[in-house]
């Protein structure tokens, strides 16, 4: 609901109120973003300047309260007395946009530039600000748990209007905050980092041409004292996949200015008369339930309003991907054999990754060509796809459409299609980007990718992009608009094709891609211990239904770390489960484990993918329909470990719950030569007997079963003891380094949830 009363605008849902007002001077003053309020409460949140501060520049010399520098504002200009960072820069010209009018629109106001946006909004508020030669439209759309903001600048004059900066929003919040960002790099994405916001500006930005693995566009502002389950937290994100910028800075008056939008480094757009520039949509959320409360608001928004309609709430298949198992070394016979093994293990989708086209026997050639390599696939893609589907599997295929190798037929025919500049080429992973600003390039991709999807009846696409861009400023923005055009033209007519976006892993995990791609490959790092940080970081802003999460071989290619097969699955369950290893090397004991893993995941798939996600003291939990699944994850063990508790949140305290830990295999070989202390024969730790036993047999590992009240589980129950170096028993948890548990908690009171 959006209300306007005596100059006060009020966006209100069951979860929040957002209020601002038009001042006597036509500026927009922010009042409140938080708990639902009455419109009549608005005056209580007004920043009253009194006689003002010294050194103020005022809009009206007769009004000492007309200084903008000490106000909480919704938008600000340049050279009018507000010396904080401005969201708008007009190439060195002053900006003084004042309120003119408003409209309340039903639903979402469509964007006109080709940018994606959130769908199915309730109402939209349009605010018009003007100055001579320029008009600014501010759009606010109310969603149940979030609101979105964006801006459109229009040249209403007779000459050129230079634009060098235009943010999606600017907002001043009272109070002190910590800015929480999610940073990293290739195979080390989205690690949480907390930075106090003070007088020095804190910036979160990307300049790689993509939203980047270095700095995810989503970030939080946490009020002092906030934790996972209590305290005030604001969340912000951008529906955009290119260079982004966000900043936060606290003023002398205790106001924290936050803004976000396209990164305008090296940006200049000269708007002709009547021409407009439209910013991406920014997303804002508030919670007084700590970080988990904020995550819940963002998760619901993404699942309900960002993900393509066809895939909202739809279960994602358990997939097998050929990359880590085969890389470029495969042929049709090997792929069909892997498909036989995959379907036997319980997989539902077979994905052929890189290496199927042109002379693609390594990563130095072939990108840009779409002719199937008949030496590897003599029956073509249709023939392979038919064989895969005949086994009861769906068939998926990897593409990297945005890139081209200089050693490719496409580049030899159209070198001008590559994104280059006046200097010698600089390559990334031996490749250039195609210039998606050019219509002929976009047409080529739409025709070739779309044709192959239709001919081979492909059910799933992994869309990769493996290098950073050289495009600067406005050119980088136009490249992203070209990408969105290609994605829209390929996938809008084929909504049933499941698109998984990838960019060297998590280099483009953002809301813009999620408007087309229901899930994203989180990282090229499949080590589950690294994934605890990567997926854990993503979970603050993105739901687990968007996480591509695979079980891979041990030791892990990215870390050389050895981890239990159970832990690899236990981490991957909290996302869209897949397997990515050479299946022919699985031991008999591992085959049994994987079959049990896929069966367990399918049984609880809806809970894992769409349940309410919470970060806990010991790991993660998801809850849906009276079922909670709690993961307990260990890193390095210590000698003589103490007692461990499991606390479960979000239960009905009076109800009874059955609690069962997931049975997990304990490899015999984990004990090595220690077995000689418990078996009647002297076991050679390097001998054939132990190797055979380790391949075929496993031990029980501390299954715990009980029935308890919700209050008990919320208080924290004692788990079975961990291994303490005093021997093995079936009723202890022998986990070792990087071990983990899954607990299944089910409500025993039908109809109470």
Task: Give residue ranges: language-model regions.
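Carbohydrate-binding surface patches
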Residues: 15, 220, 228, 617-654
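Polysaccharide-binding surfaces and accessory modules of carbohydrate-active proteins
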Residues: 7-10, 14, 18, 28-249, ...
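C-terminal beta-sandwich/jelly-roll accessory domains of carbohydrate-active enzymes
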Residues: 637-753
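Active-site neighborhood of glycoside hydrolase catalytic domains
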Residues: 373-380, 412-566, 570-591
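Glycine-rich, aromatic-flanked loop segments that form ligand/cofactor-binding clefts
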Residues: 65-111, 225-247, 284-310, 347-354, ...
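Short Pro-Gly-centered flexible turn/kink motifs
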Residues: 94-102, 269-288, 737-746
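Conserved, mostly hydrophobic/aromatic
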Residues: 15, 151, 274, 320, ...
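Aromatic-lined carbohydrate-binding/catalytic grooves of carbohydrate-active enzymes
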Residues: 311-450, 458-460
């Amino acid at each position: 609901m959006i209300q306007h009363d005596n100059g006060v605008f009020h966006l209100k849902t069951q979860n929040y109120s957002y209020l601002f007002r038009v001042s006597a001077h036509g500026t927009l003053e922010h009042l409140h973003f938080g708990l639902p309020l009455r419109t009549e409460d608005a005056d209580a949140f007004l920043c009253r300047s009194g006689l003002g501060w010294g050194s103020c520049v005022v809009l009206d010399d007769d009004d000492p309260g007309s200084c903008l520098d000490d106000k909480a504002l919704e938008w600000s200009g340049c050279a009018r007395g507000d010396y904080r960072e401005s969201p708008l820069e007009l190439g060195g010209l002053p900006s003084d946009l004042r309120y003119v009018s408003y409209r309340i629109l039903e639903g979402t106001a469509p964007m006109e530039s080709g940018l994606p946006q959130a769908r199915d909004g309730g109402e939209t508020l349009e605010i018009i600000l003007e100055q001579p030669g320029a008009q600014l439209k501010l759009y606010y759309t109310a969603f149940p748990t979030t609101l979105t903001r964006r801006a459109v600048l229009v040249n209403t004059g007779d000459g050129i209007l230079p634009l060098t900066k235009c943010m999606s929003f600017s907002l001043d919040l009272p109070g002190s905050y910590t800015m929480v960002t999610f940073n990293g790099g290739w195979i080390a994405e989205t690690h949480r980092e907390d930075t106090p916001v003070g007088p020095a500006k804190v910036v979160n930005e990307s300049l790689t041409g993509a939203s980047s693995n270095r700095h995810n566009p989503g970030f939080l502002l946490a009020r002092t004292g906030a934790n996972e389950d209590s305290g005030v937290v604001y969340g912000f994100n951008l529906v955009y996949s290119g260079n982004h910028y966000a900043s936060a800075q606290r003023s002398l008056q205790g106001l924290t200015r936050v803004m976000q939008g396209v990164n305008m480094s090296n940006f200049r757009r000269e708007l002709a008369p009547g021409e407009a520039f439209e910013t991406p949509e920014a997303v804002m959320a508030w919670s007084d339930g700590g970080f988990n409360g904020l995550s819940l608001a963002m998760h619901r928004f993404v699942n309900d309003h960002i993900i393509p309609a066809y895939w909202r709430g739809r279960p994602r298949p358990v997939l097998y991907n050929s990359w880590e198992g085969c890389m470029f070394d495969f042929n049709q016979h090997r792929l069909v054999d892997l498909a036989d093994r995959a379907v036997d293990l319980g997989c539902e989708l077979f994905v052929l990754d890189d290496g199927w086209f042109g002379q693609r026997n390594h990563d130095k050639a072939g990108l840009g060509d779409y002719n199937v390599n008949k030496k590897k696939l003599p029956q073509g893609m249709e023939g392979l796809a038919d064989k895969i589907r005949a086994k009861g599997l769906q068939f998926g295929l990897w593409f990297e459409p945005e890139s081209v190798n200089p050693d490719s037929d496409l580049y030899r025919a159209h070198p001008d299609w590559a994104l280059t500049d006046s200097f010698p080429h600089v390559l990334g992973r031996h490749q250039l980007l195609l210039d998606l600003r050019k219509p002929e390039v976009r047409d080529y991709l739409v025709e070739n990718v779309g044709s192959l999807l239709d001919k081979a009846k492909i059910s799933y696409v992994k869309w990769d992009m493996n290098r950073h861009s050289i495009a600067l400023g406005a050119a980088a923005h136009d490249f992203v608009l070209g990408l969105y055009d290609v994605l829209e033209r390929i996938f809008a007519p084929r909504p049933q094709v499941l698109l998984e976006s990838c960019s060297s892993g998590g280099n483009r995990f953002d809301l813009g891609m999620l408007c087309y791609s229901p899930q994203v490959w989180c990282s090229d790092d499949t080590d589950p211990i690294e994934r605890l940080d990567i997926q854990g970081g993503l979970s603050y802003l993105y739901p687990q239904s968007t996480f591509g999460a695979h079980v891979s071989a041990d030791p892990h290619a990215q870390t050389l770390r050895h981890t239990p097969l159970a832990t690899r699955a236990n981490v991957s369950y909290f996302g869209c489960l897949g397997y990515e290893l050479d299946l022919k090397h699985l031991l008999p004991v591992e085959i049994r484990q994987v079959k049990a893993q896929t069966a367990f995941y399918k049984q609880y798939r809806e809970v894992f993918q769409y349940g309410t996600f919470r970060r806990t003291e010991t790991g993660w939990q998801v809850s849906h329909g009276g079922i909670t699944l709690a993961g307990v994850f260990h890193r390095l063990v210590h000698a003589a470990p103490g007692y461990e508790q499991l606390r479960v949140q979000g239960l009905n305290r009076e109800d009874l719950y059955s609690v069962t830990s997931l049975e997990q295999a304990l490899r015999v070989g984990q004990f090595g030569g220690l077995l000689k202390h418990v078996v009647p024969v002297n076991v050679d730790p390097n001998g054939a007997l132990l190797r055979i036993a380790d391949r075929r047999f496993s031990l029980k590992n501390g299954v715990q079963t009980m029935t308890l009240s919700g209050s008990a589980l919320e208080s924290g129950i004692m788990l079975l003891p961990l291994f303490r170096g005093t021997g093995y028993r079936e009723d202890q948890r022998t986990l070792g380094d990087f071990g983990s548990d899954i607990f299944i908690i089910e409500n025993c009171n039908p109809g109470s949830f």
